Design a protein with these regions (language model features):
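Beta-sheet-dominated interaction scaffolds and their linkers
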Residues: 42-85, 93, 132-135
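Structural signature of outer-membrane beta-barrel domains
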Residues: 20, 97-99
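Short, solvent-exposed loop/turn segments enriched in Ser/Thr/Gly
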Residues: 70-77, 156-170
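Intrinsically disordered, low-complexity Pro/Gly/Ser/Thr-rich segments with frequent PxxP/GP/PP motifs
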Residues: 105-161
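Hydrolase catalytic cores
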Residues: 1-26, 169
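Short, hydrophobic/aromatic beta-strand segments
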Residues: 86-94, 103-105, 159-160
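A eukaryote-biased signal for short, well-structured alpha-helical docking elements
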Residues: 24-49
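Short, acidic/polar linear motifs in exposed loop/turn regions
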Residues: 82-86, 98, 153
C-alpha cells in the first residue's frame, strides 16, 4: 500500500506528465518559467497509460542547469513508466527556447519566448528501445531515456549577441 506522500508524489507526476502546453498569441509555447508543466488536465492524468519520472526528485521536470562554458550542450535523463499491460510508443520531440529582446528598448527583455532551432539525440539507458526518436516501452515496464540537446552555432550566437552576460535556455 502506498503512503499519502507516495500518492501525492504520483499525483503530481501524473498531472505534470499529461499537462497541455499553453501557447501565446503568436502560437508559441509560453516559457516554462511562466507556465510550468502547462495546463493540468485531470482527464489526461486519470486516463494516461504512462507518465514520466526523474531520478532524485519528486516532480516530473527536467532542469537544464547552468552552462558556464556556453557549450550549448545539455544532457537530461528521465524515465517513461508504463502503467498499462500493452506496449506503448512515444515520439520524442523538444521545443527549445530562450528569452527575446524588447523591440521598443533593447535594454529590456520582451518576456516572450524566442524559439530555438536545435538538435537532440536520444538513447535508451535501460528497459526499452528507440528507433527514429520513437521510444517503445513494454507493458508495465520502465524505460530510462537520455537526451542530449545541442544548440546550433546560430542559436549560440543569437544568445551571446542578445545577452552578453548570459540567458536561460529551456
Amino acid at each position: 500500500d502506498a503512503t499519502v506522500k507516495e500518492l501525492s508524489i504520483m499525483a503530481n507526476q501524473l498531472l505534470m506528465s499529461t499537462s497541455n502546453i499553453i501557447l501565446n498569441e503568436q502560437g508559441n509555447p509560453y516559457a516554462v518559467r511562466k507556465q510550468g508543466a502547462g495546463l493540468a488536465s485531470l482527464f489526461n492524468a486519470v486516463n494516461t497509460k504512462a507518465y514520466l519520472t526523474v531520478d532524485g526528485i519528486d516532480r516530473s521536470k527536467l532542469e537544464l542547469k547552468d552552462d558556464p562554458n556556453r557549450t550549448g550542450v545539455y544532457e537530461m535523463e528521465f524515465n517513461l513508466v508504463n502503467l498499462s499491460n500493452e506496449t506503448l510508443n512515444y515520439r520524442l520531440s523538444i521545443v527549445g527556447m530562450t528569452e527575446s529582446v524588447s523591440t521598443s528598448d533593447e535594454e529590456f527583455v520582451a518576456e516572450k519566448s524566442q524559439l530555438l532551432t536545435d538538435t537532440f539525440k536520444a538513447e535508451i539507458i535501460q528497459g526499452g528501445t528507440i528507433d527514429n526518436n520513437v521510444v517503445t516501452v513494454n507493458g508495465n515496464g520502465v524505460c530510462k531515456i537520455k537526451v542530449t540537446y545541442t544548440l546550433t552555432d546560430e542559436n549560440k550566437k543569437l544568445i551571446e549577441d542578445s545577452f552578453p552576460y548570459g540567458m536561460y535556455v529551456e
